[in-house]
Amino acid sequence: MSEPLLSTDRLVKRFGGLLATDNVSVDVRPGEIHALIGPNGAGKTTLVGQLTGNLAPDSGTIRFAGRDVTRLPTHARVRLGLGRSFQITSVLREFSALDNVALAIQAHDGHSFRFLGDVRKDRKLRDAAQRGLDAVGLGARANAIASALSHGEQRQLEIAMALAGEPRLLLLDEPMAGMGVEESQRLVAFLHGLKSRCGMLLIEHDMDAVFALADRITVLVYGRVLASGTRDEIRAHPDVRQAYLGEETT
């Protein structure tokens, strides 16, 4: 079995009297989609904040790419290969899809303050951005203004932007949110194909998507890991069925 690409060991985070993550241990292996599910308030967002470096754990450790990154800032984790998409789309709506990806590439390369006009003149950069759009199925929409894209296309664009840094691990925070059935199915198919490029930690409420995609699933309830295992193990777990999947057990 391969060494985990990302692992946490007994992460604890408190907000006053609220224990948001209670000794959470989870890992993601290379080429794996590991889904993190749980009801609202389960601690998923707090856990992701600790993984990205936006929140510091009170105790516990985080390892990524063979290093202890518990106290590393966000930008250092990005440099190591940690990418993220957000629960709410973060594209620049007034710019084209190609501009969005080009700006993401140059930001990752350390040129965040170049003017957009300079970016548009950089043929090498724009070719790379076009390849990024082609990879997520948006090549034909390169010149479309982001605000004119469908919600599903904006999600694909955001993933293209996250992939601009060639991450080893991608954190996907509710990528199906707000999508219709057909858009969700297309994104599921795309994420399946993405597994060969990077591992993924998927935070998602769409159970059809979760069980279609995940190699393993971890269930959080009240900040604790209730269960972790394969799709079949989670489906059959009596506590999960009762507490989260909404089924009565006998």
Place the predicted regions along the sequence by residue:
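Glycine-rich phosphate-binding loops of nucleotide-dependent enzymes
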Residues: 2-250
